[in-house]
Amino acid sequence: MKWKKILYITSFFVVLSCKKSDNQSIKSWEVISENVQYSEQNDKFLLKSRKFEYSFEKKELPFSKVVLLNNSLLGYFLELGQEEKIVGISGVQYVYSNEIQQLIEKNKIQNVGSDQKYDIEKILELKPDVIFTNYIETFENTYKILQDNGIKIIFLDEYLEETPLDKAAYLKLFGKLLGEEKQAEEIYTKIKNDYENIKQKAQKSPNKPKVLANEMYGNHWYIAGGKTFSANYLKDAGADYIFKENQDKKSVPISFEEVFVKSKNAEFWVNAGNYRTKKELLAMNAIYEKLDVYQKGKIFGMNKRRRGMANDIFESGAVRADLVLRDYVKIFHPEILPKDTLVYMQELK
């Protein structure tokens, strides 16, 4: 009986020791945002991005040859100084960065098509370590062809995050995947601290101006859902978004008549496209002239850093939440940031 007791005790401590060893090699999940998190488990790197889950060998990191099928992800690479790891990109006409355009001209970055049709043959020739893209259901067949040919695709839908800082936090994920973890953490911390500081100042203002946002496409006005990062920018900037009670996490199409009624007391109209003048705005849709805010308020477009079809607010602005918030606060509460000038936005005259 005594030897059985000794064997039991010995076995218990062996199992306990093994469990402790296993736990030491398994890290808890690192939460990047509401939709993205990753974990390192033994020799595996695990990633969750909304409904998608990935597992690959840690020795595959850092990635050194990347294809981007969405320009909105470009800003993260630029912020980390990792643009030379990009070997292919789609929609080159929408690229704002001079650095990227120069790399395209030198053929160091290849044009791999557009959001209408990707150049599968070109992508396969490039043999990238990974493709980063937003998930678009209509391209499911294209994704399958690439995956069947051994190409790794990671779907990242940063535009579906609810808060600007969650969207900016993808910088930390790219830092991990590109071997720039420390730099990414430092940059993100600075962005977050600056954002929170500006937000705190704006929240203290007793004045909360009513604000209309976005514009019409076809016969509908696509408002920012009340739970989108766009709506949260306005809230954090100390504004009263007229559709704040909406509970959607994406853009919502509504009629012009609904906007007309709801925007009666709006003092500002922001995110009014890429137009530079009110005349350009009316040329797109003359019905805007009926809005009170068009006649009496101030209108701001996301047009200050625009070149051709490219706009930097969708590039660097995807990461620099602090600069975007500064623009909104400068518009709604100029007294808070008297020395600042607008970075991405500009008033339509």
Q: Model-flagged regions — what are they?
A:
Residues M1-Q24, Y328:
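Bacterial Sec-dependent N-terminal signal peptides
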Residues C18-L74, K182-L212, K278-K279, Q295, ...:
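Bacterial Sec-exported substrate-binding components of ABC uptake systems
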Residues F45, S49, K59, S64-L124, ...:
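A short, structured surface patch at a secondary-structure boundary
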Residues P62-S64, Y76, I109-S114, V130-T133, ...:
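Second-shell loop/turn segments in exported
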Residues K65, L165-G179, Q183-E186, N271-K349:
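Structured C-terminal subdomain patch of bacterial secreted/periplasmic proteins
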Residues V67, G113-Y118, I136-E140, E161-A168, ...:
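Soluble non-cytosolic domains of exported or imported proteins
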Residues G91-N98, T138-N141, D157-K172, N207-N232:
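Extracytoplasmic ligand-binding site segments that recognize negatively charged/polar headgroups
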Residues K201-N285:
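Flexible, glycine-rich surface segments
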